């Protein structure tokens, strides 16, 4: 099974999506789902002494402007194992450029954690935590000589619109799943 192509984008898109976790919170290893095989591949070990501040992955059957599946960050209290499917509620979007390409990332919370039941939009996330996430993504490629720019945060509605657009981009690239 290749989860990128065979999993649906979510049970109630765009209100609830599947986050296919590639990288657990706290990791310095950057894993990526191999789009051809569906296996997890070590892409690189971060050059910097940083670690991922959130669980990080993709939304299945999506494609984005950077030429990859649409990225999703899930705020969890405990790290999740790679290749875990998390039902996630989008609450915002980080507006970012990576080497000049639009590389926005959905920010979400797990549906099945009562701790986050009242987190519905970006304003529900403590600003200090948003700043930590932005700082990580602003700096994590610096020692590789690559440039990333975090331009700010969008709300849940903006995230949901981008999810729907990413699903359409997937259909254009790979064909509509029957």
Curated annotation (Swiss-Prot):
Question: Has UniProt tagged this entry with the keyword Metal-binding?
Answer: yes
Compartments annotated for it: namely: Cytoplasm
Pfam families (alphabetical): Pyrophosphatase
GO CC annotation: cytoplasm
Q: Which residues bind Mg(2+) 2?
A: 71
What binding partners and quaternary form does the record give? Answer: Homohexamer.
What is the official name of this protein in its record?
A: Inorganic pyrophosphatase
């Amino acid at each position: 099974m290749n989860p990128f192509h065979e999993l649906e984008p979510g049970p109630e898109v765009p209100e609830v999506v599947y986050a296919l976790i590639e990288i657990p919170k706290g990791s310095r290893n950057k894993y990526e789902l191999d789009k051809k095989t569906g296996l997890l591949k070590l892409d690189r070990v971060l050059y910097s002494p940083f670690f991922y501040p959130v669980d990080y992955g993709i939304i299945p059957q999506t494609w984005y402007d950077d030429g990859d599946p649409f990225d999703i960050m899930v705020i969890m209290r405990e790290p999740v194992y790679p290749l875990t499917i998390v039902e996630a509620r989008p609450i915002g979007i980080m507006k970012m450029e990576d080497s000049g390409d639009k590389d926005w990332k959905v920010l979400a919370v797990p549906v099945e954690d009562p701790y986050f039941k009242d987190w519905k939009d970006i304003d529900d996330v403590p600003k200090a935590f948003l700043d930590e996430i932005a700082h990580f993504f602003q700096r994590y490629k610096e020692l590789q000589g690559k440039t990333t720019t975090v331009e700010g945060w969008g709300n849940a509605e903006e995230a949901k619109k981008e999810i729907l657009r990413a699903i359409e981009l997937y259909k254009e690239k790979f064909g509509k799943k029957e």
